[in-house]
Structure formats: structure tokens, C-alpha cells
Amino acid sequence: MIQLDGISKVYKIRSGYMKYHDLYALDNISTTFRNNIISGITGASGSGKTTLANIITGYDTDYAGQILYNNSPVRTAGYVRYVFQDPYISMNPVKTVEWHLATAASINNVEMSDAIKKLEIAGMDYSIYKDRYGHSLSGGELQKLALAISIIPEPEFIVLDEAFSMMDSITLFKTLNFLKQLKKTISIIYIDHDINRIAFASDYVYILNHGKIIEENYTDKIMNDPLNDFTKELIKYSPDYHRRI
């Protein structure tokens, strides 16, 4: 369980000569992300989704407030893993898939055979991909590789920040269904700007706007009976894939 207590992130923005004003990327966020569910976070661009992900995973430590991991302020090694938006940054283009797996396995003291299993269940055939270099993989393939690497150490939580944005619709559908199985052993925080993807995969949804969680509830409640006007707008102007099908 991850508990946020009064999390704020403020940037000083210059507004004139020797003048600055505060810009709240996150504004006093207090909530809980529970175990063994998919917690979906969505909202407008610039609403603070990635900033929140950076703080939860420890990549940004310059913030106000407190985070508790299983009721402790200390994040133990391996507790949470982060899958970034851009796999071209996180994956080495001149190293093979096998190298990426072996490196992750070595760092986390995991047998290579177990790392290969993670790649397979993430949807990549090791025998086909092991000798492929990073630069030869598509964006969607790199995103599957990044997902596989994130679960090699079997963390308690993974944070997925727009982690499937380069996948085709078939691969995306399979990956989101994979997450529904994965949550039985690894709790998931899934961030996406598309509320329909969030609704398809998530058990519980958080709506961010201007650095605040303006609404949170179980997915069916959010989609069928939203309370906040911004949430209603998000749903109204999002393509309804179910009706198209």
C-alpha cells in the first residue's frame, strides 16, 4: 500500500524583474493506492500525472508532504518499479534484448531463466527477440521489453506512465488484459491520458486536474456517475470505443 499525505510540488516561475510566483504542479494530494488492484490515473495534459509518478517512485525527492510505503516512510529496495513514457530513453539501442534481460537479472539477483519467463508472459518470444538490438525494435516492442524488465524483481508496485502509447490496438488490448492477471501478484499504478484505456484496465480511478485529485472512485462509478464537471467533460469528449465495436 502506498499512502500520500499532503504531497505538493511547487515551481518558482519568474514573472518579472526579481519577481516570482508559485506554480503548483501538485497541490496537497492525500490518497491511498491499494494492493492487488490496478489504480488508474488520468487527466488533462499538464495536470501533474508524470510529476506524481516521479515522486511516488523516488525519482523526484524535492516535494512537500509524506509518502508511506506499507505504513513506513522508507521505500525499501525493490518495492516499486517505474516504466517511463519513452522507451527509447530507457533502453540501450546498441544492446540486445538478451543483454537487457541479463543485466536486469544480475542487478536484481534473479536467475536468467526467470527473467526470460517474464519476457515471455509480457508477450515477447525470447527465441525470436534475444539477438535483436534495441535500435531494431519498434516503439511498441521496446515498451513490452520495458514492462518485462520492470517485473523481473517482482516488486510490490509498478508505476506505468503512458507506458503503452506506441502499441498498436491489438498489442495494447493483450497488454491491458495481461495487467489484469499481473495485479494478483504485483500492484499497479497505471497512468494514461485516455480515460477509456484507464476504464478498461483499472479497478479504481483518480482524476487529476491542475495538480489536484478532483475525483476518485471505483471505475464503474466514475464512468457511469461522475460527480466533477471536469470528469464529465473528459468522458464526454473521449471516443467511445465500445459503441464503435
Which functions belong to the PLM regions below?
Residues T42-A44:
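The feature captures the beta-strand-to-loop junction immediately N-terminal to the Walker
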Residues A64-G78:
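Conserved ABC transporter NBD signature motif
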Residues Y133-L137, E141:
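Conserved ABC ATPase signature
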Residues I198-F200:
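A short, surface-exposed alpha-helical micro-motif characterized by mixed small hydrophobic
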Residues M223-I245:
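C-terminal boundary and immediately downstream tail of ABC-type ATPase nucleotide-binding domains
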